[in-house]
């Protein structure tokens, strides 16, 4: 340990005489023996030199505590003069990099290489001889620092043959370095290459050959150059000299003996040695944490751009973003062991050296939340005052400029806090003592020091549940090591070049382990195991393919010749108790309670399993992952006592579910370890370690039913757990349960896990891997979506392509947006030639392909007989590439039907070859050549091919804006000659560049993804189109439906024509339309008859075949023929007794009794209220319950959609949606809910009723009817902000001058049948004034879930408003039947109008009243707003609809023009009057 207390201590001990040094060691040994009951190893006397004694003391107690013990011992020895001089020297030595001296108020100056360790030479005691000085000088470093490390390493290793010699990181970091390489050099960061073939992410360096020794020499040379430039030498592995890393056992952590250190950890590698082993991590800045939707969704291109992440350097964490604003809160989020805590501490240390944020922050404070949780009450002033690095300035002065303060909160999610929003209970002043969580809640809630900045580390992405005030935070995900960083890590860990090469080669040859090593903690674990084998001169072997087996290997090596089975069981029990109690620090009493005494504790400390924290004395596992690993072993080892009839796996499941909750269950390392330990290999290793036979009751296959209930098909964490088992039989059974999958994959490790598990699924049809395309509002059925921010290396492309060889059901592969090397393309083409590869669609848009790649693709297509669609858009293929493809496409055996070559750098030179394909290919039906410079010459050549009698093409994509008028006329003539041919153009030029790779392939699908995105999750027509695909002509249902598939209004490059208003055309009129209770179908609204209001019985006659939707209920029918249907809304109460057992099912929707002619209904879409948006609920758990005379029968639905359950060819009886549950999981099911607000005006006051219910139309209707009886009127307000949870309690509050008491103040979200009394809150307002603000919050964490402003205008019925110029009035009953323009294109307008608010503003006061305007705005999506607007328009006359048409024309001219143009082609509308 170069410098700091170690250097000073070594200097003064070297000055002691031999007899004094011996006495010094004996006194220390006596002190240590007096504490041996606490598990400390007694100090060992008879060290031969002061240097050795200093090394031992620092290794055993930590720098600061070793220094304090030395001072105290010198006083006992009577060396008061030496003690005083040492204290004085320490107090005036700010140059020590890690001494407890105070930094200056300004940015710390950067030390030069000659000053790193020199100051303590001048602190030698008076009378120090020249010889002794020379003896010290011999140990000083040269400019590179290498000689110092060599000497200190040698001394430390010789002095401690039996002591631990490996320091370990905190809960988030391995012993080896894991932080970002920005601290290595503060010049400009390395610029990423723009070449599309780059195999590494920005910032990775030195792709050198490890076999030549150049790589190793290059690293050492770079370290020397840094030192020569004036930077301190950078780092050995976690603080111990490199040569000391010859044992498996790491040290416990010595901590400095100050109160500050009991709260804010200072770790033992806090020195130059650690920094020199620094290895770069990948940091990905995101607009939102992974798996969370953005707050505001805009059009699809903007939406994609908003959610695209980018790699970021640590120096830019607090830099301005695209909005030029600098963030105040930065959140470092990542998996366990990924390096977050190390990175956080490095920020503090780099700032202290003047290398980071010196111009931004004057003070930086690091707080470990693990330690902070131990404090009962503390004020911010006390916390800062106890920070050993704080300046001597008064606290008031430090806090006078909060904008210059940075608080680092490490592991904020570890203690299980809920850091509430500001309230009266939170502290408002920095001097006020508070519980630690309240203090942090006040800081983050901005009730104190609102201008301060924060750097927060956490595992979970659900921090907004813990800290509700994080809306403006900058999210940065720590992805781990890149390919080259992993390699560099190995070369820095092993200081011997030959050892480094051997270890690196061995691990890289194990592809699974090499992928797992992107997690720094796993890299450290692998290196440590190999180092131990080298030390023992054993043959190097490391066959682990999972993290579980690697941990078992580590433990087995540490336990050689040390049978500690019973003691290990006690340690496992301690770990499990900590997991249940969210506890990571254990007192000596905690250990004794589990049978762990001083000697055993000392053994575990030396083995590197536990670490000690001296003041106050406590212990923790060396890493939180180790605690989770031992906790998992505790579950497996637990005996059968007290288990009763429950299976072991159920007990294990209940314990982990209790500890982590259903949302965190599969993301927890404990669950992964548990499944890994239950695998065959895991059981064998555990039996060898514990020398026992494990219980036969713990069979991995027993987990299958429970996992099928709990596993989330869109959860990568679930696949991580399955991967740990690597059991084919187990995986086949579990994966067969998945019917559709969708997930986000961003690293080699995640890709490995995903592709491994997919091999065992029989239902996955589509595999999509697109860079930067994280969020989608809809998922295609049976689809896996893979997203990456770092280019996949060739080795892992091969792993991915191996899936195609074994998964015969995979039909579609989308790799758009990923940079493919030439080697990767060759691997893919070899796969395409395999007979077992049955791909039908391949999308490679924006993959950086070249003409040479086209040659390989043509070769791959030669043997493939199944591929029908190929998308190569946005690649610079050039004419040469197109010619290679044409050679294959001309062959009669080629089955390709669709080829997309958008923006591929093509010119007229390749058009002759393309024309020959058009005239020769028997299968090609669609060719997209947009955004290529074909000009008139090239297009004329294409026309010759199109006129050939053998041409089968029916769709041709061309940009016509660059063509001459003569050429355009020729194309129109060609379309007349060939009626089946459609020449389309739907992309704006320059929308995308060849490297962007947006969803070009899906844009041209018969049902485009662009269209699906705009339709959104609530558009019923999307369900209709799917349901009618086989038997119905969609164009008959929605006459203009295919227009949306042909073009997009925002990208049509045509001039706007002057289209007259439909009001001026005498043949356009309206027909009588229905009310909100009507169905909507192919012919418009269909009236619904109320047969029996008391029984909620309705009758409707569907006049023709087609799809019909009931907006008020969400119910949908797909009819084969005209038929009359009766619908009765029932109550569940009378049938619940037939559900056995009751607790295993949850009611998830209304109960309906439908009567219809058998066979007349093709499909029915029944609404449900389970929130599926986040992918937290397994859709296979849904069942349709039929109640017949013989009892309840369950039917598996044909499919589960976002808001509906679909039954095909249904048989009818009372039926409703149920969700299968497990014990105690009800509170984890997200529910779509609504807040119903009613009011009644009295002379003196206004009475309000507020309901919080699941979104069930039958319950809502029952409440409406009840409130109407008491003359209450509903006020329409938006639904809750997020899904809520059954059984949770929510508080209702309000603010306003006339607001009276709310009774009750709490509501529980629960399901009560429509016939039961529903829970509601009642309150009175005496004087409404300008309005009252109502809020509903989660009682547990005070999270705001609903908010609304009630204004006086809300209380006035619409009929009382003064009608404006053209307020909507009913249409005359004798109006002709031809639909108005806005009615004819109703579904198109609902799906594609994006600027709804602008349209509403134009209608406000002219067509819409204030109440109607707010009702429309209250809907939560644009399609819902448009649908509500159209429900109001049903009673409008022609002038009102003309007003809507005019507003739409002004807001969306391209859309209106397109609808007119397409309608005129079909004879539906004239182009002019």
From Swiss-Prot:
Q: What does the UniProt entry list as the effect of changing residue 1437 to R? A: Abolished formation of an inflammasome filament together with PYCARD/ASC
Outcome of mutating residue 1186 to A: Complete loss of autocatalytic processing and of IL1B release. Autocatalytic processing can be restored by treatment with hydroxylamine
Substitution effect: residue 130 to A: Inhibits cleavage by HRV-14 Protease 3C
According to UniProt, residues marked as the site described as Cleavage are 1212-1213
Regions of compositional bias (Polar residues) in chain numbering: 170-182
Please tell me, according to the UniProt entry, what happens when changing residue 1460 to A: Does not affect ability to induce programmed cell death
Where in or outside the cell? Cytoplasm, Cytosol; Cytoplasm; Nucleus
**Substitution effect: residue 1454 to E:** Abolished formation of an inflammasome filament together with PYCARD/ASC
Spans of the LRR repeats?
Answer: 809-830, 838-858, 866-887, 895-915, 923-944, 950-973
Q: What is the effect of changing residue 1422 to E?
A: Abolished formation of an inflammasome filament together with PYCARD/ASC
Q: What is the effect of changing residue 1322 to R?
A: Abolished ability to form the NLRP1 inflammasome
- InterPro entries xref list: CARD (IPR001315), CARD8/ASC/NALP1_CARD (IPR033516), DAPIN (IPR004020), DEATH-like_dom_sf (IPR011029), FIIND_dom (IPR025307), Leu-rich_rpt (IPR001611), LRR_dom_sf (IPR032675), NACHT_NTPase (IPR007111)
Effect ascribed to mutating residue 1450 to R: Abolished formation of an inflammasome filament together with PYCARD/ASC
Q: Where is this site: (Microbial infection) Cleavage?
A: 130-131, 333-334
Q: Where does ATP bind?
A: 334-341
Q: Which PROSITE patterns match?
A: CARD, DAPIN, FIIND, LRR, NACHT
Span of the annotated motif ZAKalpha motif 2: 177-183
* Motif residue range(s): ZAKalpha motif 1: 111-117
Give the start-end ranges of region Disordered.
90-113, 160-254, 991-1017
Question: In which tissues has expression of this protein been reported?
Answer: Widely expressed. Abundantly expressed in primary immune cells (isoform 1 and isoform 2), including in neutrophils, monocytes/macrophages, dendritic cells (mostly Langerhans cells), and B- and T-lymphocytes (at protein level). Strongly expressed in epithelial cells lining the glandular epithelium, such as that of the gastrointestinal tract (stomach, small intestine, colon), the respiratory tract (trachea and bronchi), and the endometrial and endocervical glands, gallbladder, prostate, and breast (at protein level).
Q: What is the effect of changing residue 1276 to G?
A: Abolished ability to form the NLRP1 inflammasome
Resulting phenotype, residue 1212 to A: Complete loss of autocatalytic processing and of IL1B release
Keywords attached to this Swiss-Prot or TrEMBL record, sorted alphabetically, are: ATP-binding, Cytoplasm, Disease variant, Ectodermal dysplasia, Host-virus interaction, Hydrolase, Immunity, Inflammasome, Inflammatory response, Innate immunity, Leucine-rich repeat, Necrosis, Nucleotide-binding, Nucleus, Phosphoprotein, Protease, Repeat, Ubl conjugation
Family recorded in the similarity comment: Belongs to the NLRP family.
Q: What is this protein's name?
A: NACHT, LRR and PYD domains-containing protein 1
Organism of provenance:
Homo sapiens (Human)
Q: What gene is this protein translated from?
A: NLRP1
